[in-house]
């Protein structure tokens, strides 16, 4: 799932042919690779992510700027929530495992 998610995002960015956007996206991926990987392991949220990807794709294909922008904003908000939740869950499970060792 993680690789397909990364390909989806890269495909859109590359298709833009917008050099500053491509460079920003590359830097973003370098900084947040682990966060995105941890977030992608959350199976419960995959359906939501796929639905958002479909909405964004449909809006792009329709060349509907407003719908595309709204879809992207919603997707970014969800991604931030997913990353926060994934790290909170990951930290809690690590903390629980450490306490079990005592």
Task: Tell what function each PLM region has.
Residues 1-38, 49-59, 67-77:
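Conserved amphipathic alpha-helical segments that form helical-bundle/coiled-coil interaction surfaces
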Residues 26, 46-53, 90-99:
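Short alpha-helical linear motifs
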Residues 41, 45:
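Solvent-exposed loop and edge beta-strand segments that line ligand/cofactor-binding
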Residues 65-102:
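C-terminal effector-binding regulatory domain of bacterial HTH transcription factors
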